């Protein structure tokens, strides 16, 4: 019988964390061995996610959990301030990482990439675990060959800490890598209110919306002479991310380097 991969989840009290606990607990090839959250007070995971038979209590010290449980994989859904140190601690002791937390900067990603190579363990940084979102990014990248003028609108729940989203950044990067030219700027354009034209990543404007009731949504809008093209993805429930989370956990165990974007594991 194939040995189950031993997994711990950091950020277990968050909305994505709770869904991830359920998904791992329900998968025959994965074993949930610990759950971590800085706000934890010893809660029972079984009570938290409504699955009986899990004898696991929430803990609040990730370094202790890594040392005591020696997992195969750390799944991180914490926050931009914690994720880098969490991943670095795990990689240093040979623990594979799946990072769903956005907010890592280029320097931090390079350091994690170097550490993964030194330790020969895989680390996956995934801006979006929804298969539909990955397809949206791929379609947008293809469309950019023919429609170089493009803007992105990303919409998320009002508790999301960072802007723009990792998905929007990744989409803009893929567009810039694939479009043959970048349109000239409108030099006469000016903002009556600072920031109203959005952020600019390689001449792709990104607009961030934060409202209660939303989960994760993105539109990529292309314009051309006499026509337009809109590519949109909507996540209506966090359960829609879970097939991707489970797949990435299993796939990253076969890698020995940093992987950025789920499309590179499909």
Swiss-Prot record:
A GO CC term attached to the entry: cytosol
Pathway assigned in UniProt: Amino-acid biosynthesis; L-lysine biosynthesis via DAP pathway; (S)-tetrahydrodipicolinate from L-aspartate: step 4/4
HAMAP family attached to this UniProt entry: DapB (MF_00102)
Source organism: Syntrophomonas wolfei subsp. wolfei (strain DSM 2245B / Goettingen)
Record: residues binding NAD(+): 11-16, 100-102
Annotated residues for binding of NADP(+): 39
Enzyme class, spelled out: oxidoreductase
Gene Ontology process terms (BP): diaminopimelate biosynthetic process; lysine biosynthetic process via diaminopimelate
UniProt: (S)-2,3,4,5-tetrahydrodipicolinate binding residues: 157, 166-167
Keywords: Amino-acid biosynthesis, Cytoplasm, Diaminopimelate biosynthesis, Lysine biosynthesis, NAD, NADP, Oxidoreductase
Protein name per Swiss-Prot or TrEMBL: 4-hydroxy-tetrahydrodipicolinate reductase
Gene transcribed to yield this protein: dapB
Keyword Transport: no
Keyword Cytoplasm appears in the UniProt entry: yes
EC number: 1.17.1.8
SUPFAM superfamilies: Glyceraldehyde-3-phosphate dehydrogenase-like, C-terminal domain, NAD(P)-binding Rossmann-fold domains
Family statement drawn from the similarity comment of this UniProt entry: Belongs to the DapB family.
């Amino acid at each position: 019988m194939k040995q189950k991969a031993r997994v711990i989840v950091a950020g277990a009290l968050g909305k994505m964390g709770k869904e991830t606990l359920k998904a791992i607990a329900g998968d025959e090839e994965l074993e949930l061995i610990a759950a971590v959250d800085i706000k934890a007070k010893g809660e029972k995971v079984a009570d938290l996610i409504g699955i009986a038979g899990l004898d696991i209590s929430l803990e609040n010290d990730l370094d202790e959990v890594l040392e005591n449980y020696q997992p195969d994989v750390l799944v991180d859904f914490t926050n931009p301030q914690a994720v880098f140190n969490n991943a670095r601690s795990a990689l240093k002791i040979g623990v594979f990482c799946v990072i769903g937390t956005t907010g890592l900067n280029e320097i931090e990603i390079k350091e994690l990439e170097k550490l993964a190579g030194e330790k020969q363990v895989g680390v996956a940084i995934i801006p979006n675990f929804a298969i539909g979102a990955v397809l949206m990014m791929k379609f947008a990248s293809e469309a950019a060959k023919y429609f170089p003028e493009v803007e992105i609108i990303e919409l998320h729940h009002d508790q999301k800490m960072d802007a723009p989203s990792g998905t929007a950044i990744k989409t803009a990067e893929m567009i810039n890598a694939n479009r043959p030219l970048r349109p000239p700027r409108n030099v006469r354009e000016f903002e009556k209110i600072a920031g109203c034209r959005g952020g600019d990543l390689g001449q792709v404007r990104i607009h961030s919306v934060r409202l209660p009731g939303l989960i994760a949504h993105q539109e990529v809008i292309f314009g051309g002479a006499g026509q337009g093209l809109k590519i949109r993805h909507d996540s209506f429930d966090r359960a829609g991310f879970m097939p991707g989370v489970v797949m990435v956990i299993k796939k990253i165990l076969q890698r020995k380097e940093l992987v950025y974007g789920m499309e590179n594991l499909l």
